[in-house]
């Protein structure tokens, strides 16, 4: 068991432009951290730096209180699970799981014990003699994880391990990964572009954008209190509604570009007259009535999702999505009267994009 620390780590390919800006992260012993962000945000590069597969330009990496910044990958005490299973097709499941230990010179008895235990944990006991071609995608991924488990690493590194699986298998493997971490309690750093994976697996999430950690927090924190416009727009499906406008002179209302005026929950007078963005999640908008002071929205389209429905409309040029109950199915062109929960409104600075 070990902790992981990244201290002001940067990466530059040309010595000028930083693709990873100075980034500091403390991962507690046994903690499961997920790095999530769009393609090209730097999350896989950062993971490879921790693994020793990419050189750190500046800063330091520590594993178990030992500085490993220049250390060879094999000496860092890490095990990595990739997007591609990378199994040897001519070897059995048992041989694939044992191979890394064999080339390290571990004794046969110890190898057999470790493989047996990993197979038991991953429910691969009855598949040890099979070849990869005889396995399903989920079983192959479990073999790849078993190959990492037998090494008994200080830190697990996962690089989008579920992205090659179909939707149903991904759900199953997410649950298996949760159970695996609860059992092993090994420090883990996991990379994905899938926010559902991030929210369901992580104890803490690091949302990355353009080589910067926009926010580090629990899944609940990043969902309920996004630190920036990027986090607000990236986390959540559908994304948070983001509406541009200004706070009125009294700080009591938000005036949207397009004439709609929304009440604020007070305390915003210091932002009077400033260009701001107001955010609210679709589930925090309720159906109301004109008599109750509801705000009108002409619905353009309705998405029927089964458990609930999504109504789409516009206030001027600004799009709005409202999550409705399963039984609510208004027709296109009808007017919805809406109430926005004032205690669920988020304000972001119009220039910096940061939460205020």
Curated annotation (Swiss-Prot):
It comes from Shigella sonnei (strain Ss046). This is sn-glycerol-3-phosphate import ATP-binding protein UgpC. It is an enzyme of class 7 (translocase). Keywords: ATP-binding, Cell inner membrane, Cell membrane, Membrane, Nucleotide-binding, Sugar transport, Translocase, Transport. Its main location: membrane. The keyword S-adenosyl-L-methionine does not apply. GO terms for cellular component: ATP-binding cassette (ABC) transporter complex, substrate-binding subunit-containing. Residues 4-235 form the ABC transporter domain.
């Amino acid at each position: 068991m070990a902790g992981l620390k990244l201290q002001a780590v940067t990466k530059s390919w040309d010595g000028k432009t930083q693709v990873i800006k100075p980034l500091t992260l403390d991962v507690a012993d046994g903690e499961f951290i997920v790095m999530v962000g769009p393609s090209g945000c730097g999350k896989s590069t950062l993971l490879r730096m921790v693994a020793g597969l990419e050189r750190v330009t500046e800063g330091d990496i520590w594993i178990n209180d030992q500085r490993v910044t220049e250390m060879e990958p094999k000496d860092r005490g890490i095990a990595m699970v990739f997007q591609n299973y990378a199994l040897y097709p001519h070897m059995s499941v048992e041989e694939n799981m044992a191979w890394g230990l064999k080339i390290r010179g571990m004794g046969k008895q110890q190898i057999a014990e470790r493989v047996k235990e990993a197979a038991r944990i991953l429910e691969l006991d009855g598949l040890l003699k099979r070849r990869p071609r005889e396995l399903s995608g989920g079983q192959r991924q479990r073999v790849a994880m078993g190959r990492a488990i037998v090494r008994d690493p200080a830190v697990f590194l996962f690089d989008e391990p579920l992205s090659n699986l179909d939707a149903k298998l991904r759900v199953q493997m997410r649950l298996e990964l949760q159970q695996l971490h609860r059992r092993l309690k090994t420090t883990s750093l996991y990379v994905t572009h899938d926010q559902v994976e991030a929210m369901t697996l992580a104890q803490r999430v690091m949302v990355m954008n353009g080589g910067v950690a926009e926010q580090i927090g629990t899944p609940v924190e990043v969902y309920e209190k996004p630190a920036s416009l990027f986090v607000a727009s990236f986390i959540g499906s559908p994304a948070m509604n983001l509406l541009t406008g200004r706070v009125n002179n009294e700080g009591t209302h938000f005036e949207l570009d397009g004439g709609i005026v929304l009440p604020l929950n007070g305390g915003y007078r210091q932002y009077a007259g400033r260009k701001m963005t107001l955010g609210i999640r679709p589930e925090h908008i309720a159906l109301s009535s004109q008599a109750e002071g509801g705000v009108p929205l002409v619905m353009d389209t309705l998405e029927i999702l089964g458990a609930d429905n999504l109504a789409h409309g516009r206030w001027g040029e600004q799009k709005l999505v409202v999550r409705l109950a399963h039984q609510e199915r208004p027709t296109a062109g009808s007017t919805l009267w809406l109430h926005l929960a004032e205690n669920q409104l988020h304000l972001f600075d119009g220039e910096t994009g940061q939460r205020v």
